[in-house]
Amino acid sequence: GYHAANFAFRHPGYVSHLFSMGGAFDIKSFMDGFHNDDVFYNSPLDYLYGLDDYELWNMDIVLGTSNWDICFDANLKMSKVLSDRNIHHWLDIRQDKKHDWPVWKEMFPHYLSRIKFF
């Protein structure tokens, strides 16, 4: 989820659809207190407020998570940032699922089936 989201948000002109499944979007917790521009510009929760590329508002964004996902709070925060920016997205919260392959195997085909081609 993180890498898909970070790439899509940094390069929205190349991405039409973003499916993030169980993503964490703030890398600061992995940096042991270190912070510089590289950390900032690789933490979507930080840099999204400053972006104004119109393609962000054209992207189809899905944040897939579950109520037992270790990244559940991160997805709620990302949804809030996107909502604050009026960027349309779908926060898909599955019930009673963990941060693991079985739920992602459910999510991915469902998300693919929702893509509208032409």
Q: Model regions: which residues?
A:
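Non-catalytic cap/lid and distal C-terminal segments of serine-dependent acyl enzymes
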Residues: 1-118
